[in-house]
Design a protein with these regions (language model features):
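Alpha-helical substrate-recognition element adjacent to the catalytic core
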Residues: 2-110
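C-terminal cap/substrate-recognition subdomain and adjoining C-terminal extension
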Residues: 85-203
Length: 203
């Protein structure tokens, strides 16, 4: 049976792996735990070895339950440069089950000022409503979301501050959006015109 829930696409670096720790040289935000990952295949996939002592990432164990609380209203899927390895290394550390993975283009080449993942998302999410956590959206992506919504496919881009990662207020926005879509679907009213995009970063 076709899943009628909207998709919820989840990036790793920034939304889950806070940039405040690994990329700025500073401390991770409160609630985050540092992990060291070891995987010999990283050299083959990305052309360089893991950092000595393992790759350090910062994850918040609260993110797993926070995302799972949305699973009754959204179908969760990875949309990340980690690709399938998100299921191997990220999900288990925060309590997520194995999730579908959006096939993404090779490399990180932007197209017409859009986020590099957009071609993969357009193909994967064809015909479905989409909410998306990422920290690399551009103004062109916001325009894409607005047009997609106006064309009848509700689209919510949640801009995540990579220093703090996904906050409860971000998850609440997705939950409210998905509940609105469900109510609209039951009533039979068109979804176009409801508030469906979050373009501002959380305070």
């Amino acid at each position: 049976m076709t899943d009628t829930r909207p998709l919820l696409l989840i990036d790793v670096d920034g939304p889950l792996n806070a940039h405040g720790g690994p990329y700025s040289g500073g401390d991770a935000p409160d609630g985050y735990v540092m992990h060291r990952l070891h995987n010999g295949s990283f050299t083959d996939e990305h052309g360089r070895p893991w950092a000595q002592g393992g790759l350090r990432i910062w994850l918040n164990p609260a993110h797993g339950p926070m995302l799972l609380a949305l699973a009754d209203r959204c179908e969760l899927a990875w949309c990340t440069a980690w690709r399938e390895t998100a299921n191997e290394f990220i999900g288990p550390l925060i309590g997520l089950p194995e999730l579908p993975v959006v096939p993404l283009p090779d490399g990180w080449v932007t197209l017409n000022d859009h986020i590099w993942k957009l071609p993969g998302v357009e193909e994967y999410a064809a015909g479905r409503a989409v909410a998306w956590f990422d920290d690399e959206f551009t103004p062109a992506d916001d325009e894409w979301a607005e047009k997609r919504t106006a064309d009848g496919l509700a689209t919510l881009l949640v801009h995540i501050d990579p220093v703090h990662g996904i906050r409860q207020c971000d998850a609440d926005r997705v939950g409210e959006w998905a509940s609105t879509l469900a109510a609209v679907s039951i009533s039979g009213e068109p979804a176009v015109g409801t508030p469906l995009r979050v373009g501002d970063r959380a305070p």
